[in-house]
Design a protein with these regions (language model features):
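Pro/Ser/Thr/Gly-rich intrinsically disordered low-complexity regions
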Residues: 1-68, 138, 395, 405, ...
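Short, solvent-exposed beta-strand/turn "edge" segments of beta-rich domains on protein surfaces
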Residues: 67-77, 84-86, 160-166, 498-500
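Exported/extracytosolic protein signature
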Residues: 74-78, 87-94, 106-108
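Asparagine-centered strand-capping/turn motif at beta-strand->loop junctions
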Residues: 83-90, 98-100
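An acidic, Ser/Thr-enriched
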Residues: 108-152, 158-163, 170-295, 459-460, ...
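Von Willebrand factor
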Residues: 284-345, 370-375, 388-400, 404, ...
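Loop/turn elements at helix/coil->beta-strand transitions in domains of secreted/extracellular proteins
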Residues: 323-327, 367, 391-394, 422-429, ...
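VWA/integrin I-like adhesion module and closely mimicked acidic/polar interface patches used
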Residues: 402-448, 452-456, 461-467
Length: 668
């Protein structure tokens, strides 16, 4: 067992200060026996815990608050259990509030009082509303959990607890961890709102490919184990004494970051009980040069900090553009302006001239999105048509903070114009700055053109958010990727316009050939204009005895990914096609008890409680007041041991706490 109990580090361990913003670090798996670790290095990258203060309810004692998360091959199931006692001499209302990642699906909720458990039931939204209305008419209280739009961000319910009685809340949500910039992120939000006697966060990660102890570009090593565990169990005193804490205790975000080992030319193909999942992220591919057009809104609404942060981000991005890339800059208000009439090579002279142009960008005028995007497409078409070979990836990046107010302003017309102009030849990414933008319009336009929409939050780190997005698409490796399998059905998306360095393609499906002993995958794509092919195979017999493959997880992963992709596809359709997609997504949501935009969860509570309807916030809801942040360092060999983090028999991750950040950012 790895343990360093003889080194009892103080709660406020000294670690290097962070001058600008927190950086993220991999979670390291340790397998004992090991010697006690040394202090953390200044190059470590750090996950973030935000501390949010909230009032403690008088007479209400949250005596146990547990968060347990099991991650199997990137699929995470998280269970939050809160046990509460009413110490008062009269009945009190007890609240249960949980925040979760936006792409997670709630799959279970229950309340237990006086030996009686009240379970949530997932239904169609209309049926859920009817059940709620009936419960209210009978004088009962019914909690209604709904998802608005395509996000799941918060869950709140309450129940009246008699004097000296207890209640147990339990909520389960599920998610597929997405690989971004070479790492997976598991976000856990813990907000018990008071100091808790029994506080514990227990995360268990199982990856059969192994978890590297170092994720640097030039060095990757791993321990023999394919498991890692984070066990965070602070005492009451530690919950009070951490920076920014007090009577309200710990309350905030815990971010765990890791990656897996990868053979250079192979993916990871797994089969279990008639379902399969294929993770594909090759590392033996040369970088493909790209053609990129930046389309920047400089209308009057970008006044002040927004335009300053945009300039700052563009200057940083230009510092990182490789010389073999070609690029163009377009700014627009009611008029479209091009820095150059065509795309140019990213030579030092051209980059310096582009920086001079960016420094002079000023806000003025209205917003003509249609003309700006069409001009960007025209420039790309002229440039790519003149290329002798198709060895590059071509993308457009639109940044805007408002609705179109000049030129063509009908949203459907703009989307149709852009889709026709692009013609599946290029990828369009749409970045919406702030909360006044029509995010649904931007997201739909991006999805129609093989891209994604992304919100840029108007906080102190907005420039870093812009840079971070560009980093995700800065290094294309493969284009026109096709994933092919034999003897399968109900397969998720199998074609992808681009595969970028640091990302991962995930495909899941149903194995229909009962005689199939070995599932084979053939992946085709283009690298620098040349076709490349990869092959993966997995034996049902081998996977059946693999301890890292779970029957439940692969099937639920398939259902989760299918529903997510159907909801994206449904946005782009109309008429009978739209209804068919909605029906399939609804049926899967009901079968697997997922709370999605098409379903709601009803919980009928004890008689006499107040009626209550509970909804999820819409995408784009502005964040609440700023918070102080406390950094938790997740490291491997280089760390000061944190007493509240218990060691495990096979692995552990240690924490130490630094000084809080003071810039007030919500999106660090």
């Amino acid at each position: 067992m790895f343990a360093c109990n003889d080194l009892q580090a103080p709660l406020y361990s000294c670690v290097p200060s962070v001058s600008h913003h927190p950086l993220w670090a991999p979670v390291h798996s340790l397998k004992g026996p090991h010697s006690c670790p040394s202090p953390i290095s200044s190059q470590a990258r750090c996950p973030l815990l935000k501390v949010l203060r909230s009032p403690q309810d008088h007479g209400i004692d949250i005596y146990s608050f547990h968060i347990k998360s099991e991650v199997r091959s990137r699929y995470a199931m998280t269970v939050i259990t809160s046990r509460v006692a009413n110490l008062a001499n009269e009945s009190r209302e007890v609240n249960f509030h949980v925040e979760m990642p936006k792409h997670a699906f709630i799959s279970n909720f229950s309340m237990t009082m006086d030996g009686q458990t009240y379970n949530g039931v997932v239904k169609k939204k209309a049926e859920a509303q009817q059940q709620y209305d009936k419960a209210v008419s009978r004088g009962q209280s019914a909690g209604l959990v709904s998802s608005v739009g395509r996000t799941l961000e918060e869950f709140t319910t309450s129940v009246t607890v008699a004097a000296h009685k207890k209640v147990t809340f339990e909520l389960t949500y599920e998610q597929l961890l997405k690989r971004r910039l070479g790492q997976y992120e598991l976000l856990i939000k813990a907000k018990p709102t008071q100091v808790v006697k029994d506080f514990k966060i227990d995360v268990h990660i199982r990856e059969r490919q192994g978890i590297p102890s170092s994720t640097s570009a030039d060095h990757t090593s791993s321990f023999p184990t394919s498991q890692a565990r984070v066990l965070f169990a602070p005492t009451r005193q530690q919950q009070r004494q951490c920076p920014g804490c007090g009577a309200d205790g710990l309350s905030g975000d815990l971010l765990i970051v890791y990656d897996v080992n990868r053979p250079k030319t192979k993916g990871d193909l797994q089969i279990s009980q008639g379902y399969f999942v294929h993770y594909f992220a090759p590392t033996d591919v040369n970088r493909t040069s790209k053609n990129v057009v930046f389309i920047i809104d400089q209308s009057g609404s970008m006044h002040g900090r927004k335009i300053e942060q945009t300039r700052e981000a563009l200057l940083k991005i230009l510092d990182d553009v490789p010389e073999d890339d070609h690029f163009a800059l377009i700014t627009f208000d009611s008029t479209v302006r091009s820095w150059k009439p065509q795309l140019v090579r990213a030579t030092p002279d051209n980059l310096e001239a582009a920086r001079s142009f960016v420094r002079k960008i000023q806000d003025l005028g209205a917003t003509d999105i249609n003309a700006a995007v069409l001009e960007g497409v025209r420039m790309l078409k002229v440039f790519t048509d003149g290329q002798k070979t198709n060895k590059t990836a071509s993308i457009l990046i639109l940044l805007t903070d408002g609705d179109p107010t000049s030129g063509v302003t009908n949203l459907d017309t703009i989307r149709a114009n852009v889709k026709e102009a692009i013609g599946r030849k290029y990828t369009l990414y749409c970045l919406g700055f702030g909360f006044d933008v029509n995010y649904e319009f931007l997201e739909k336009m991006a999805l129609q053109n093989d891209g994604v929409g992304r919100r840029i939050y108007p906080d102190s780190d907005a420039a870093l958010q812009l840079q971070g997005f560009y980093e995700e698409v800065a290094t294309p490796l493969l284009s026109d990727v096709e994933m092919n399998y034999a003897g399968v059905s109900d397969v998720t998306q199998t074609t992808f316009s681009q595969y970028y360095n640091g990302s991962e393609i995930v495909v899941a499906g149903h194995v229909t050939d009962n005689e199939l002993e070995t599932l084979r995958a053939v992946v085709k794509g283009y690298s620098e204009g040349n076709e490349v092919k990869y092959e993966d195979a997995s034996s049902k017999n081998d996977d059946a005895t693999d301890a890292y493959i779970s029957d439940v997880y692969i099937q639920r992963l398939w259902a989760y990914l299918t529903v997510q992709q159907l909801l994206e596809k449904e946005v782009l359709l109309s008429g009978s096609d739209k209804e068919a997609i909605r029906e399939r997504a609804l049926n899967l949501s009901l079968k697997y008890s997922f709370v999605t935009p098409l379903t709601s969860m009803v919980v009928t509570k004890p008689e006499g409680d107040k009626s209550q309807v509970l909804h999820k916030p819409k995408e784009g809801k502005q964040p609440v007041s700023k918070s102080t942040a406390v950094l938790l360092q997740f490291t491997g060999p280089d760390v000061l041991p944190y007493p509240a983090l218990q060691s495990a028999a096979f692995s552990t991750v240690a924490l130490s706490i630094s000084n809080p950040l003071t810039d007030g950012s919500d999106n660090l």
